[in-house]
Amino acid sequence: MLFLLLCNNLYYIPIQALFKKGSTMKLITAVIKPFKLDEVREGLAEVGITGLTMTEVKGFGRQKGHTELYRGAEYVVDFLPKLKVEAIVDDELVESTIDTIIKCAKTGKIGDGKIWVTTIDQVIRIRTGESGKEAV
């Protein structure tokens, strides 16, 4: 919330009123299988996504872990290697971004990953101080 003092009168302005409707940005986060990264990156470039952040992560879900044999001994691997891919996109690109990630990352097997969407309040480019869409 924002309070504004004008001519000795205090006004309350909902923070949403400062943004034009539809001008918000979203953080699309996807956890995918590592070998699908190039396909996902190329697909996102085709729909206009110009920047990504990628982090190597480990996790498990329904896929659980698996047993590996190393030098004659069995080891249980509980956390499986995945990649977390993140992109900040304008509202208009959210659905095409999600559709592209699904199309490019899907193998049809357990462990294909997850996608979630988070609202971004503000983005600032450190070098120039630009903010909002211009910073993406």
Language model features with spans:
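Positively charged, small/polar-rich N-terminal and surface patches that mediate targeting and assembly
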Residues: 2-136
